[in-house]
């Protein structure tokens, strides 16, 4: 892609972003990101979060999902969040900055979880996008596979998994893998998710024993 084309594409994205009604609402409400609204819509339909829960948030920055979850789980609940990028503190959120793919970071994250299992693992991770699906989709699938591995390690029986996935090669196989681990699996496309985006959200509940 030429610099001229890239510049035009970037300009269109910025124009679309700042005119987006969810971006405007997020700014008015003092929210970290428009992702807050995606999670709110999913919570209204699927009721994933309840007071006192422990939740793992992978790909947490800038904190839209963590910010939402603390309003649902209350003071006795706990969010353990991780991201490669920095994130401003949120009351009720234990944040670890580091690359989730790094074994030392994963070990530190598991230590924060401790011996008790968690009730929800959620993943909004995405790689740096090149704009080429043949490159971006495999990178994304690798990240969500790691998130599913995290579920196997820390998610309690009956627990839930929420993950953003980009549709493309490997999606159907990944969906089958999730269905083998959970009793109920749904695919959501929240209104706050841009229509042209390949992203969907898999909501898996009832972690099998």
From Swiss-Prot:
**Primary residence:** cytoplasm
Record's keyword terms, sorted: Cytoplasm, Methyltransferase, rRNA processing, S-adenosyl-L-methionine, Transferase
Q: Where in the cell is it found?
A: Cytoplasm
Question: Is rRNA processing found in the keyword set?
Answer: yes
One CC-aspect GO term: cytoplasm
What catalytic activity does the UniProt entry give for this protein?
uridine(2552) in 23S rRNA + S-adenosyl-L-methionine = 2'-O-methyluridine(2552) in 23S rRNA + S-adenosyl-L-homocysteine + H(+)
Active-site residues annotated for this sequence: 164 (proton acceptor)
- Provide the top EC class: transferase
UniProt keyword Glycoprotein present: no
**Molecular function (GO) terms listed?**
rRNA (uridine-2'-O-)-methyltransferase activity
Q: Which family does it belong to?
A: Belongs to the class I-like SAM-binding methyltransferase superfamily. RNA methyltransferase RlmE family.
Q: What is this protein called?
A: Ribosomal RNA large subunit methyltransferase E
Name the species this protein comes from. Answer: Yersinia enterocolitica serotype O:8 / biotype 1B (strain NCTC 13174 / 8081)
Query: Which gene is this protein's source?
Result: rlmE
